[in-house]
């Protein structure tokens, strides 16, 4: 009797596994590097519980939006609010699928154990930048919000000219790596992007008066081939489990006033 029950259970488990495998999909995700550490973790957990596979193409929100507009196909778009808005206006996002799931501000990263200058006020931050030997940040030419904003801020605060000889642009857009390797004294980027780099610690966020909040959003592509599974992943990104991972990695909840459809 026990043997029969065991065999029946084994057969049932096998059949369930076959059905799950047959229904499993590969979700093609285009995602901003601003949430890379969190999304890698969450995607692995989602794969384990759903049976689906998640294939992620990384880039800046602006660069990925351009690729979609140029005709590339994805199922789920995980971008900055600005990037998703650009695609939504061009009819590239499924109506009603957009969700804001996290936000972040700019921070300053230093190598662990390095001196910690004061950056608590705009004046102190400017002084730190002027005294720095080198500053790493994403190349503004790449269109990433961190690099574009910091370049504009330097111009506005009057240290753009001095910054030119100190600027270090990371090839992969992760400014913290140049600090960790000793190639730069400071790194300016989204807080979660700095936290994800081993050997880097957060000196502090930019003063509130000169900082900017970036909202991270997701939406199902209008041309999605795996719409149902994409919605499953989208809902998972709004779950309490996902919120805990985002918080762990230095992300904040999205502002209540941020746009979502």
Regions found by a protein language model. Give the residues of each.
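Bacterial N-terminal signal peptides that target proteins for export
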Residues: 1-11
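Bacterial N-terminal signal peptides
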Residues: 9-20
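Exported/periplasmic ABC-transporter solute-binding proteins
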Residues: 23-62, 66-70, 78-91, 95-104, ...
């Amino acid at each position: 009797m026990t043997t029969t029950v065991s065999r029946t259970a084994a057969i049932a488990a096998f059949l369930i596994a076959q059905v799950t495998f047959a229904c499993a999909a590969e979700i093609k995700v285009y995602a901003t590097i601003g949430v890379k550490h969190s999304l890698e973790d969450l995607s692995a957990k989602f794969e384990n519980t759903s049976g689906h596979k998640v294939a992620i193409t990384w880039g800046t929100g602006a660069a990925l939006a351009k690729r979609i507009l140029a005709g590339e196909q994805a199922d789920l778009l995980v971008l900055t609010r600005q990037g998703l808005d650009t695609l939504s206006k061009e009819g590239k996002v499924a109506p009603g699928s957009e969700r804001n799931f996290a936000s972040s501000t700019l921070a300053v990263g230093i190598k662990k154990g390095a001196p910690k200058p004061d950056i608590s006020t705009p004046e102190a931050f400017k002084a730190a930048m002027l005294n720095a030997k080198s500053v790493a940040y994403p190349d503004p030419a790449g269109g990433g919000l961190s690099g574009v904003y910091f370049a504009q801020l330097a111009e506005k605060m009057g240290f753009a000219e001095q910054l030119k000889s100190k600027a270090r642009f990371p090839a992969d857009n992760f400014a913290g790596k140049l600090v960790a390797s000793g190639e730069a004294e400071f790194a300016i980027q989204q807080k979660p992007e700095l936290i994800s780099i081993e050997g880097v610690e957060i000196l502090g966020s930019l003063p509130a008066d000169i900082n900017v909040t970036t909202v991270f959003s997701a939406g199902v592509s209008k041309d999605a081939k795996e719409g149902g599974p994409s919605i499953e992943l989208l809902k998972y990104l709004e779950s309490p489990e996902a919120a805990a991972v985002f918080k762990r990695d230095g992300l904040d909840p999205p502002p209540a006033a941020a746009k979502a459809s």
